[in-house]
């Protein structure tokens, strides 16, 4: 059986590429090679899975920023590394957050409140 974190990571990628509305639990189960029942047993419902994917996405961004900061030899190099990644981060963020804001406003509110703290 696949590890839950792998399912979250792969589903996050799918949501960024195709949007949260376009991806159904059937699509995720099929893509991951698991039954829909297993998916529901692991996550309960799509809303819970989206929340976990969003947390994973933010954590991935935080980890990338930390790696870039550690890799840089000085502040200017750190800034250049961050600029290099900025477009891809923002593109993925916008695609993911737009769908969540429109179709899952409760999750959006929780996520934006958590990030403000």
Model-inferred region functions:
Residues 87-117:
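Short secondary-structure transition hinges
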Residues 1-18, 22-31, 48:
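Basic, helix-initiating cap at the start of DNA-binding domains
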Residues 49-57, 64:
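Alpha-helical DNA-contacting segments of helix-turn-helix folds
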Residues 33-43:
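Short hydrophobic/aromatic patch on the recognition helix
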Residues 30, 44-45, 55:
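Residue-level detection of the helix-turn-helix DNA-binding "recognition helix"
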Residues 52, 66-92:
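Hydrophobic alpha-helical connector segments
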């Amino acid at each position: 059986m696949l590890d839950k974190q792998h399912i979250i990571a792969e589903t996050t990628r799918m949501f960024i590429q195709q949007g949260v509305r376009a991806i159904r639990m059937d699509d995720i189960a099929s893509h991951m090679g698991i039954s829909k029942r297993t998916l529901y047993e692991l996550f309960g419902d799509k809303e819970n899975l989206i929340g976990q994917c969003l947390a994973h996405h933010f954590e991935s961004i935080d980890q990338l920023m930390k790696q870039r900061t550690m890799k840089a030899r000085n502040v200017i190099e750190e800034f250049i590394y961050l600029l290099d990644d900025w477009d891809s981060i923002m593109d993925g963020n916008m695609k993911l957050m737009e769908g969540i804001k429109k179709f899952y406003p409760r999750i959006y509110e929780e996520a934006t409140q958590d990030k403000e703290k």
